[in-house]
Amino acid sequence: EIASVGRDGFEYYDKLGYVPYPEVPEATAKTLEYAYADWCIARFAQSLGKQDIADQYYQKAQNYRNLYYPEHGFMWTKDAKGNWRDRFDATEWGGPFTEGSSWHWTWSVFHDPEGLSELMGGHEPMVARLDSMFVAPNTYNYGTYGFVIHEIAEMVALNMGQYAHGNQPVQHAIYLYDYIGQPWKTQYHLRNVMDKLYNSG
């Protein structure tokens, strides 16, 4: 029984540096969100002159690294014993993720794009991974949801590969091209999103 606020699986997160699955539902999403929240706490503590607290939380903000699966080049999930979950499937929704798949949550490192780039092998491999997201077949495995949730239907309707603008963890990914030196791709994909999803009404 947990409250409606706080951190589900915090005991694991503090001990292991990640929230494990299947012990905790949506564990990878929670790990990535906690890491970003820790970075925010660090920035706040630093602004108050509490550098000891800031340093502690800057270190915790690196916990996203614990769930990057280098063999596949995506965020994935581990159990409490540190074992990677088998049967890797980047198109699987639910399970360790919230309303998305590994394709979407891999980019949920808002506070450290350079660190994520390093995990991927540098800017060039990161560009290649971004490029592949927009051209990959928009197939899906609805996973633990057991049916097509509206975010899946929206991704398919958008028809921009595995990019799912209907869910927050990946919405910023288009702007990563600006960060890694290919701003024309940001412009191209943004125009595509604007034309398909927005109007003056």
In which residue ranges do the predicted regions lie?
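Active-site core of glycosidic bond-cleaving carbohydrate-active enzymes
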Residues: 1-62, 66-201
